[in-house]
Amino acid sequence: MIFLFIIMLMFFALKLERAATQGLNLVTSLTTTEAVRANILSDLQSDMARQGIQVLTNPQQGVLSLSENILFDKGKAELSRRGEEAIAVLAQSLYRNLVCYTVPGDGLPPKDCPTTSHSIEAVLIEGHTDSDGGDVANWNLSVKRSFNAYQFIMASNPDLPGLTNRNRQAIFSIAGYGKQRPAHPNDIDENKQKNRRVDIRLIMVPPDANDVRTTP
């Protein structure tokens, strides 16, 4: 009886140790993935800055933000000429910085890509407005802006639409949030201007994410 108890105790101790190891591996993997994403955002920001285009990044959220005054005239959904120039620069930088973390159209990553198991799951192009105006108008404006930005990004680099995730699904998609996700309180004009923006959100998956699980 005591022998069986000892065996059972050892069995549960082994399961607990295995679960703890898997949990530690998952935390380490997620932390490393966040660092990789932060580096990608930093490289995107640097590429834009070299062309005189100032953008903001939020590494914790995986977001690069382009303000309205870079891309659009106030209240308009069509890209301004300056906006088209900025998007063209962004498109080239996106391809250069994402191709190593996706599956290219021909299935072959560039030879100079680093050895990595990190990958891009999706890239969301998000439109945002301030709180001025009606909800319907803001929803429509944010969606149209994100769609127009998406179209010009794809047109600026024909290789971008061919980038896919591990499941061979297209990585780019759009979203419009209207006033629902302000970056700052909509209390003063300066903050409202900051809220009128397009965000590029990178969603990454860690290496072997599907294999990190606790044994039942």
Regions found by a protein language model. Give the residues of each.
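Sec-exported extracytoplasmic/periplasmic mature domains
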Residues: 49, 53, 92-100, 151-159
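Short edge beta-strands and adjacent turn/loop segments
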Residues: 52-65, 113-121
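Periplasmic OmpA-like peptidoglycan-binding domain that tethers envelope proteins to the cell wall
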Residues: 71-81, 110-216
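An N-terminal amphipathic alpha-helical segment
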Residues: 97, 101-102, 116-119
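Short terminal targeting/anchoring segments
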Residues: 1-35
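Short acidic alpha-helical/loop segments enriched in Asp/Glu that coordinate divalent cations
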Residues: 99-111
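Short, solvent-exposed beta-strand/turn patches at coil↔beta or beta↔helix junctions
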Residues: 36, 58-97, 130-139
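N-proximal, solvent-exposed amphipathic alpha-helical segments enriched in charged/polar residues
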Residues: 30-48
